[in-house]
Every structure is written in C-alpha cells, then in structure tokens.
Amino acid sequence: LARVQSSPTFPRLGILGKGSDFTFLSMELLGPSLSTILKLIPGGKFSFSTAIRASYHILKCIEALHIFGYIHRDLKPGNILTREGTEYPLCLIDFGLSRMYINPTTGKHLPNRDKVGFRGTRAYASINAHNLRDLSRRDDLISWFYIIYEFIIEPLPWRKVENKVQILTKKENFDVASKVSPVAPELFEIWRSINSLKFED
C-alpha cells in the first residue's frame, strides 16, 4: 500500500506506530463497500447510469494498480470502498493476494509459472484461477467483468453455487452473448477483447 500512495485510487496511509507489544497503522476513513451498498438497495441492483459510472471508476483503480506493476488477484465488490467528496469516488483495498507482475530489475513481465495455488474469491475468479494457472492483468479484467455483469445485467449464474467444480463448469458454459447483447451489446465486445488477451498483455 505504501508503494501506491501517489495514486488517489487507494486509501491514504496515516500513522504507523509501535507499542511495547503491538504495531498499529492508521489510514483514511472510507465509506461502505459496493457489496454493502448493493445489499441496502431495494432489488439489490444499481441503476444503469450508476453501474456504468462505478464500472469506469473500478477500471481506473485496476489500471492504477497495474501501472505500479501489481495485479490484485481478488477483485470483488467487497474490496471496493466508497469515498466522499473527491473526483475519485471509489477506492481499491485488500492487497493480501496481490503480486508484482513486473520484474523490478529488468522491467519485463515475469514468466508464466506452470502451476500455482488458487487465488481469489470463487465467484469472481477467472477460469485460469480455477485451473491453478498463473494469473496476470487479464485475470483482473475478467474479475472486473464479472463485477460489472452483476451491476448491469443480473447476479452471476454461479453466485449461489458452493461446489468449486460446479462453479467452474458454469463459468465454462457461460453464454455471455445471449445475456448481455439485449441490454448492453458493448459489453459483449468488451468480454471478447478481454478473452483475447494473452498472459503478458
């Protein structure tokens, strides 16, 4: 978090201190998460215009993190908090699963590892995450798409499924075109573009 303080899309750090048997960190007081807000809205859904604006600002948060050389690997509405009174109304939090994707010495993309452990939250994780593949920027964008799908279209088809194999199967059979084209055809083009990305893109 200290490395991304120059960007307003992340919480501002306050005081870091140490007591005799504890360490503490204070940070900017932020508003509720998008997940919390959705639960408070009748029908559990944003208006179309609010969903579009939120999608844009989430993407700006992701872009900022990627510019700093990190991928998040756990994007979900619960990790996006609101902030009042600024031109940056959303803030990205929870970097416990984040990882550098750029070699700080060479400036080049880190190589694709053969197999890794699962990272993320199953509802919003990419198929690559389910298949224990190394994640990159494209996987953050897939998680972003799942988020905005819920904002604009409807709950994800696997939202209430708990079995990880069944979740993966539903994702593999996810007919995005038939779901989004009648409402927001541009979303399908975004989905196609994201899925055309390679590991280092």
Where are these regions (language model features)?
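Structural motif at the C-terminus of the N-lobe alphaC helix and the adjacent alphaC-beta4 loop
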Residues: 1-8
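Short beta-strand micro-motifs within the conserved protein kinase catalytic domain, predominantly
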Residues: 12-23
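Structural motif in protein kinase domains
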Residues: 30-40
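Activation segment signature within eukaryotic-like protein kinase domains
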Residues: 54-55
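Catalytic-loop of the protein kinase fold
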Residues: 66-84
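Activation segment/activation loop of eukaryotic-type protein kinase catalytic domains
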Residues: 83-119
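Protein kinase subdomain VIII
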Residues: 106-107, 118-133
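Conserved C-lobe activation region of Hanks-type protein kinase-like domains
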Residues: 127-184
